[in-house]
Amino acid sequence: MTRVKTKLFIIGGGGHSRVVIESFRKSGSQIDGIVDPAYIKCENVVGIPVIGGDEALDTFSIDAIRLINGVGVLPGHLGRWKITERLRNRGFKFVTVIDPDAVVSSRVKVSEGVQVLAGCILQDGVTIGRDSVVNTGTILDHDC
């Protein structure tokens, strides 16, 4: 049996997406494409090809893809979570991103789809819920 390489796509091509891409690149990993209808006319964003809007995902087997949500978080704005839930309901899986420059205790619990960005410090007993963003430089002390 031949093993198919899983492709990794990031949803969104804006500012938050670029920060997450940088964190991922520092870990030595590769993102294969960007999914964002607003950037379809661009060939690439920070050197990563734009493959189209959500419909571009339909050309791949769900089992052959993993996603990163690169849509940023704004107070009172639910767009990021709506996108994730819509794609999860279709069967897609989201990866967790932890920047190599973050300090994360071995006793931290991190759920699926979480993003811990550069300069963060997560101490003993911290729990980060699904799809949360721990933004650049955040410090969460014990038992948060």
Regions found by a protein language model. Name each.
Residues 96-144:
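Structural signal for interior beta-strand "rungs" in well-ordered beta-sheet cores
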Residues 5, 68-71, 76, 136, ...:
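Glycine-rich hexapeptide-repeat left-handed beta-helix
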Residues 17, 41, 75, 122, ...:
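Glycine-rich nucleotide phosphate-binding loop and flanking beta-alpha elements
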Residues 21-24, 79-83, 128:
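Short amphipathic alpha-helical segments
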Residues 2-70:
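A solvent-exposed beta-alpha-beta segment
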Residues 69-97:
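Glycine/small-residue-rich loop that forms an oxyanion/phosphate-binding "nest" at active or ligand-binding sites
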Residues 15-16, 75-78, 109:
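Short alpha-helical
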